[in-house]
Amino acid sequence: RKGQIGVLMSRKMIPTGITIEHIPERATLDITSAPRRLQVWIEVKDSDERARVEAERRVICEGESVGKNFVCIGTVEYEKNEFNHVQTFPINAAGTVTSKAVVRVWSNWGQEYTCLYRLRLHGEDKGPR
């Protein structure tokens, strides 16, 4: 594992996508710090809801959970050789409302460290936290 970042959102949402941005390959001498495989986890406090999300998702995440009440809802792979260095991926939260998310960088393209230039979580607004 290369790192993770937690997000405490100001509003509840149903996550629907994630955008990863890194410096373009054509603008750097070394692209190997770009993330490669990432996981998206959300907090689901209710145990019945957590079980439902786990049953409905079609995702297998590597490693241990990021926390007691978290479930993995997506894995994505950032492609360092793509012309577009801003890449958006759909994720399926199975309609679950959350206000906490964690993005785990599971691997990168070879460097000892990983750089994330911008990370955006997209979703359906469900009101104040």
Model-identified regions with their sequence ranges:
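A short beta-strand element within beta-rich, extracytoplasmic domains
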Residues: 11-28, 103
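Structural beta-strand segments of beta-rich domains
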Residues: 3-5, 14-15
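Trp- and acidic/polar-enriched beta-sheet ligand-binding modules for extracellular glycan
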Residues: 1-4, 26-129
